[in-house]
């Protein structure tokens, strides 16, 4: 049985995630739990614009669209770089830059 990885939230990512509506928080938590167990989230994609090894979890709820950027290619933990509510079709430049910096 694979080791259960820790989740490490960088910067304000935990605070940002906790500001999601309850259903979106639950969905994000479930997807992060899958990552901890070495499984693939249901709806994710690589974010090469942010950096090598960075992916995003995509969550769509009645209240809107939400994203969680993370890095899983480290053996010790899943690193959550940024969590945000999408307000436009494209990911905003400031969100990409913030995730890159972390």
Q: Where are each of the predicted segments found?
A:
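Basic, Lys/Arg-enriched alpha-helical interface segments
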Residues: 1-65, 74-77, 85-102
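Portal/gating segments that form or line small-molecule/metal binding sites
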Residues: 68
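Short hydrophobic/aromatic beta-strand micro-patches
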Residues: 71
């Amino acid at each position: 049985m694979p080791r259960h990885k820790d989740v490490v939230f960088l910067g304000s990512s935990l605070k940002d995630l906790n500001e999601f509506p309850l259903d979106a928080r639950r969905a994000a938590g479930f997807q992060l739990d899958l990552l901890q167990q070495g499984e693939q989230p249901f709806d994710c994609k690589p974010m090469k614009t942010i950096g090598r090894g960075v992916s995003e979890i995509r969550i769509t709820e009645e209240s809107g669209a939400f994203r969680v950027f993370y890095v899983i290619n480290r053996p010790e933990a899943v690193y959550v770089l940024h969590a945000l509510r999408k307000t436009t079709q494209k990911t905003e430049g400031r969100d990409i830059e913030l995730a890159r910096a972390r």
